[in-house]
A protein has these predicted regions:
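Structural and coupling elements of P-loop NTPases
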Residues: 1-270
């Protein structure tokens, strides 16, 4: 109650299944509803945990069950969320065709979306997988997109959804859904649209509205020093680090002149 927005009814309550208890590390969890269904009490669960019987906890209280239930029961669907979200995160004309489509999360409207995260896979030479959300229109695997902040047009090579670290290909992604793609790299927080909808006039193109910049409350908390064994590999190191800086907007990269080492700092695993 102390931190919820004024005038809102936000709150959490274990008895209403808006609180889950468990362990992400060990893969188990429960809500009040799940305990009732299984005829268990919290004391039973904690006794098993104290005994170290993680296998029993995973088999009887798998973590995916309470997490999925809470998403379904408590999070608003994209259509409902867009009504109050878009006026706060998008700076364009809400009465325009695009503005109306964004507020309705309309899959038939103009394509508009945002890159929210970048995954760099060390198993594939730090290939960048861009993850984001379509807020309007339908994203097709044959589309080319215009990056409003970067002012560049890019074609995608693969479009799909992520399953852990793998991309599952799908032909199109309608508004309201998350997606993942290969083909290019850009900073997280970038707004994109269909390249076919970009105004011919450069001044108009430069003034296209973007989504609000992602705000991060954290500062870099982990640092690692890097030194190339072969000076000829400096360019390769710079290429990988530049990808990392785009993936983690909080990251910093500097040269320690005394040691000759490069210092990379960020909040993501380095």
């Amino acid at each position: 109650k102390k931190i919820r927005p004024e005038g809102s009814g936000w709150g959490v309550d274990f008895a209403k299944n808006s609180v889950a208890v468990g362990s992400a590390k060990h893969g188990w969890g429960f809500t009040y509803e799940i305990l009732l269904e299984k005829g268990l009490k919290p004391q039973d669960v904690f006794a098993k945990y104290k005994e170290g019987d993680i296998q029993w906890l995973r088999e009887n209280l798998p973590l995916d069950e309470p997490m999925l239930r809470m998403v379904v029961d408590h999070l608003p669907n994209p259509v409902e969320a867009s009504k109050y979200r878009i006026p706060h995160i998008w700076g364009g004309d809400l009465d325009s065709e695009l503005g109306q489509s964004l507020q309705k999360s309309d899959p038939k409207g103009p394509l508009y979306g945002m890159i929210t995260k970048i995954f760099l896979d060390p198993r594939r030479g730090y290939q960048a997988t861009l993850i984001g959300r379509v807020f309007s229109g339908t994203f097709d695997h044959t589309d080319s997109v215009y990056l409003i902040g970067g002012r560049s047009t890019n074609r995608i090579k693969r479009l799909g959804v992520m399953e852990i670290t793998d991309l599952l290909d799908i032909p199109r992604v309608p508004a309201g859904n998350l997606f993942a793609l290969y083909g290019f790299i850009c900073p997280s927080g970038e707004t994109f649209m269909s390249s076919n909808d970009v105004p011919k006039n450069k001044e108009e193109a430069y003034q296209l509205p973007t989504f609000e910049k992602i705000q991060y409350a954290c500062e870099p908390v982990v640092s690692r020093s890097i030194k190339a064994q072969d000076p000829q590999q400096i360019d390769k190191l710079t290429t990988v680090v530049s990808k990392w800086l785009q993936a983690d907007p909080t990251a910093m990269y500097r040269l320690d002149k005394e040691s000759g080492e490069f210092i990379l700092s960020g909040i993501d695993p380095l």
